[in-house]
Amino acid sequence: MSALSDLVYGKGNKPWPYFTDKYPVKVKQIEGMNNEQLERDIRDAGDHLGGRTAAKCLMTRWDMHMVCKDFWDVAEKAKEIAYACPLATKTDTNGKTLIVPLYLNDTWGLIYTKGQSAKVHNHWPSLWSYTYCIFACENCSPLVFPNANEPLSVTPKTSQIIVFPSWLQHEVPKHPCDHDRIMLSGNLNNGLELDNDKRPFWDTDEYSGSTEGPLWHAS
């Protein structure tokens, strides 16, 4: 074995075992989301990451749900889908199936212009991840899961949500269209949120619907 293999697996150890498992990738059209407002929120927020992540495009701050209610609404739809197809079952001492609570960890907006892409990545250590299409056409770049046994490529459609286990590798090829491909993404974690007292800004008396002010521009 090479020195690199020794470093990854441990000196004298064999490579990790290979598993073939099935995981749900849920694709649904949802109604009732305010796509025009979501686009405005993303454009007003602007680029906060500067291409420093796998997504080589405009990418907003991570906590858009704390300042924009419409991001929270999309997350609630993602939760509904995730609850409907748990990755495993948990029982109490009497054998009764328990519902594992999910909470929204983070969510952000993305705008892909022509030629922009997202490199292969995953969202571990979250449990579920999702992406929602605010605007795209059938010729826009798909969401690709390169490690699926059979090629899995999901063409975006406006008002489409895709929910999948966070550890699945995925990517977005270079965007071929002249118009923008506008998305939002988020992560759901299991368990109760640690900071339960932190209310979203839009759920406070101070909120007026404005995207101006120190909280909006906070890093």
Task: Give the label of every model feature segment.
Residues 1, 175-178, 219:
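A hydrophobic alpha-helix/topogenic segment detector
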Residues 1-99, 201, 207-212, 216-217:
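Non-heme Fe(II)/2-oxoglutarate
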Residues 100-174, 179-183, 187-202:
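Catalytic core of non-heme Fe(II) oxygenases with the double-stranded beta-helix
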